[in-house]
């Protein structure tokens, strides 16, 4: 109940910001002659038009400098600079569960000691679960004799056509680095007893969110944010535009997450249990005043963080 109260203190300001964002989008739609009222399916399309109008910035402009292979090299480079973790590709030398998966030997950059094996499963495909996640198949626990960590990062980026570069959005780049923060965490873990590995539930996202911060630093951008055609570094003007737009669309981002979290909390606080999830979701969103122009990030039928395992619930 205390957590719910905390979120409800944030909620009104986030909803108010959504109303401002919707007004900006509606103004553009009206100016362009679109005879519409902004609905949830319009939000992402028109938010990009607003971004372009306010900051002279588009995702397409950013993507040109975010070539996937370069970004992977960049995250490995930063891990070596910060933590002495060296990632050496050995794709083709170890078994993989899908042909597109790349593999890397993980070692201590100073001593050369091999400490892990890293699987990088980058692209979306039929049958693969949605979203992005990190997994360990074996953690380090000296009591059991397990010294080599085996883990993976899994994303759902669009696979480029043969011979074409794979460029990704800023959001996807942040996701790439976020999941790699989890990987760094489990490759640095060094315990005797298995029960002491891992992390408390309220800390689990900390390493990943810290790692996101290195993406937009100048050393990383200068070395690895290179135009996919010319190889030129990302210009300072573009970096400044990205930084200026950091608070853009935060009403949407906050409301879609908070609405999911509030439905989750109220679901677990119901003393009678929930028989009809659809009716419960609609009722709860109506009670908190969910803006009609958007939807919660995780609808209950596919809210994996609630129902995918007993560890989540």
What are these regions (language model features)?
Residues 79, 159, 167-187, 208:
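Active-site recognition of the HExxH zinc-binding catalytic motif
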Residues 177, 251-270, 287, 291-296, ...:
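C-terminal substrate/ligand-recognition segments
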Residues 188-211, 216:
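The catalytic-center signature of Zn2+-dependent metalloproteases
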Residues 62-68, 161-169, 196-197, 246-250, ...:
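Active-site rim elements
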Residues 94-98, 180, 200:
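A short beta-turn/loop motif at secondary-structure boundaries
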Residues 1-156, 213-262, 266, 277-280, ...:
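Active-site-proximal, well-structured secondary-structure segments within enzyme catalytic domains
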């Amino acid at each position: 109940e205390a957590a719910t109260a905390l979120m409800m203190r944030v909620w009104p300001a986030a909803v108010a910001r959504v109303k401002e964002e919707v007004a900006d989008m509606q103004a553009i739609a009206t100016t362009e002659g679109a005879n519409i009222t902004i609905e949830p399916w319009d939000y992402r399309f028109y938010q990009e038009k607003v971004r372009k109008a306010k900051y002279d910035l588009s995702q397409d402009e950013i993507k040109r400098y975010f070539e996937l292979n370069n970004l992977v090299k960049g995250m490995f480079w930063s891990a070596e600079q910060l933590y002495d973790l060296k990632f050496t590709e050995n794709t083709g030398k170890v078994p993989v569960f899908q042909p597109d998966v790349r593999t890397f030997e993980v070692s201590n950059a100073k001593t050369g000691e091999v400490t892990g094996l890293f699987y990088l499963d980058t692209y979306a495909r039929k049958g693969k679960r949605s979203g992005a996640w990190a997994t360990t198949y074996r953690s380090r626990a000296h009591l059991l004799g397990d010294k080599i960590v085996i883990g993976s990062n899994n994303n759902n980026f669009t696979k480029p056509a043969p011979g074409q570069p794979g460029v990704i959005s800023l959001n996807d780049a942040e996701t790439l680095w976020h999941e790699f923060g989890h990987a760094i965490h489990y490759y640095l873990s060094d315990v005797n007893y298995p029960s002491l590995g891992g992390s408390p539930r309220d800390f689990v996202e900390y390493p990943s969110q810290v790692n996101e911060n290195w993406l937009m630093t100048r050393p990383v951008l200068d070395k690895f944010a290179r135009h996919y055609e010319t190889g030129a570094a990302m210009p300072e003007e573009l970096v400044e535009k990205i930084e200026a737009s950091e608070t853009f669309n935060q009403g949407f981002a906050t409301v879609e997450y908070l609405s999911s979290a509030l439905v989750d909390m109220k679901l677990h606080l119901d003393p009678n249990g929930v028989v009809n999830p659809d009716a419960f979701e609609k009722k709860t969103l109506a009670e908190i005043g969910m803006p009609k122009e958007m939807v919660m990030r995780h609808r209950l039928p596919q809210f994996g963080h609630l129902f995918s395992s007993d560890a989540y619930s």
